[in-house]
């Protein structure tokens, strides 16, 4: 009879992946990224261990929002004071901070716990095609 294997944090081998977001739908990009960050693509997935890989996303400013989401999708933040609700749509957020749309989509798909925050730190998003992780030699992944 086989025993259940439990992976320890020290036993995890993290790889580096590169995803080009040029012309890719935001939802497909975010689901693939969140799955890899959690490590769900590995056969020995353990939900309580950070066993996900590192991901570099380039050309985040060229990600595609379907339908009329560019104007209709709203991002909310609150200052904590009465009347402190701030609302910005996707078009203005893209003009102000292009990487924020991708980061918010991926962060919303990760667990809202300490482990989820730790896994989110393995994501590197760049607006253009130049990135600082050349030395890690990331493997390119195509989003379908």
Swiss-Prot record:
The keyword Ribonucleoprotein applies. InterPro entries: Ribosomal_uL13, Ribosomal_uL13_bac-type, Ribosomal_uL13_CS, Ribosomal_uL13_sf. SUPFAM superfamilies: Ribosomal protein L13. GO terms for biological process: negative regulation of translation; translation. PANTHER family: LARGE RIBOSOMAL SUBUNIT PROTEIN UL13M, RIBOSOMAL PROTEIN L13. This protein is one of the early assembly proteins of the 50S ribosomal subunit, although it is not seen to bind rRNA by itself. It is important during the early stages of 50S assembly. This is Large ribosomal subunit protein uL13. It comes from Mycoplasmopsis pulmonis (strain UAB CTIP). The gene is rplM.
């Amino acid at each position: 009879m086989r025993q259940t294997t439990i992976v320890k944090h020290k036993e995890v081998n993290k790889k580096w992946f590169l995803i080009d977001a040029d012309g890719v739908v935001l939802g497909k990009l975010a689901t693939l990224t969140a799955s890899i960050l959690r490590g769900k693509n590995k056969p020995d997935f353990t939900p309580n261990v950070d066993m996900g890989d590192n991901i570099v996303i380039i050309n985040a400013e060229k990600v595609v929002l379907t339908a009329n989401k560019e104007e209709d999708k709203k991002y909310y933040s609150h200052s904590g004071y009465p009347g402190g609700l701030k609302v910005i749509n996707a078009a203005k957020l893209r003009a102000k901070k292009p990487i924020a749309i991708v980061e918010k989509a991926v962060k919303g798909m990760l667990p809202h716990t300490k482990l989820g925050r730790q896994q989110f730190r393995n994501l590197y998003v760049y607006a253009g095609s130049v990135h600082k992780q050349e030395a890690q030699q990331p493997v390119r992944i195509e989003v379908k």
